[in-house]
């Protein structure tokens, strides 16, 4: 089982049923304050923390007096618009006194499905975490439709973990893990502490353990675990209703851990390496040597650009003699790459008319 305090980066998913009292519709302020203490402890140990938080619709429906019944799409989106403000304020109020800066990120499925938006989102996470902030992510329920929805925050948390390169994803739930059967219906159901491989049998064990305010049952959690572990991120499902749930998990609280067989970096490299290039960048000798030392590819080291590619597309990296030396995701489209090739990075704003990124291909986005 992984240690949260030993991880480089952790994503924590918080469900509506934990954050909002299902009877009153009020925020569980004491629970949130205790969670903030856990976050501060992890940050103090050098671990980056990203929160994926439900709760906007649950908070907003009470303010708009929408009752306990099913909401129409328009009602849900209105509740989300009202609730997001209250949700962001609640996190700010518990994190700021601990010296932590909170940041809100609202995503739709397109932000991970579209490669260019994926890279933008990944860069935003990196910039926030480098400055010590705690990103708080939710699905953009105000504008998302069925076609561009994650559908549940278990799936969203797994995708955020992949985008951000997290080591561990923790799903705080109203259950303490996966059982061989639904423990509410079967007294012989056995708890599964560790799952190394998600088999069809494991998926079949995932019954519906949803609660009144949550969308995701156990099945969505297992599917999320499949996404996360394939990208090198271990996942834990654990009881979140208790005070200080992250500290409890690190102290050995009951949970189901889904193990990852590779690191996030290895999984990402394999993903990039399997792509088909849509263009190529020819490098000078100095740039080729710099890449071999683990550096990013700067525009100054590019002598030729071929192909018709867009920002975020895979491109072949070539030595001066044309031999392939790797593949990477371009941070510029072909037209922009042609304009800035051979130029210093500080010349990019003048050439393109906007402040671009210094690297043409970042070292984290290439395989040699």
UniProtKB/Swiss-Prot annotation:
Taxonomic source organism: Jannaschia sp. (strain CCS1)
Main location: cytoplasm
Residue intervals of the PUA domain: 278-355
Designated name of the protein: Glutamate 5-kinase
Binding residues for ATP: 13, 173-174
E.C. number(s) listed in UniProt: 2.7.2.11
Function: Catalyzes the transfer of a phosphate group to glutamate to form L-glutamate 5-phosphate.
Keywords from the UniProt entry: Amino-acid biosynthesis, ATP-binding, Cytoplasm, Kinase, Nucleotide-binding, Proline biosynthesis, Transferase
Stored InterPro entries: AceGlu_kinase-like_sf, Asp/Glu/Uridylate_kinase, G5K_ProB, Glu/AcGlu_kinase, Glu_5kinase, Glu_5kinase/COase_Synthase, Glutamate_5-kinase_CS, PUA
Species lineage: Bacteria, Pseudomonadati, Pseudomonadota, Alphaproteobacteria, Rhodobacterales
GO annotation, cellular component aspect: cytosol
Superkingdom in the source lineage: Bacteria
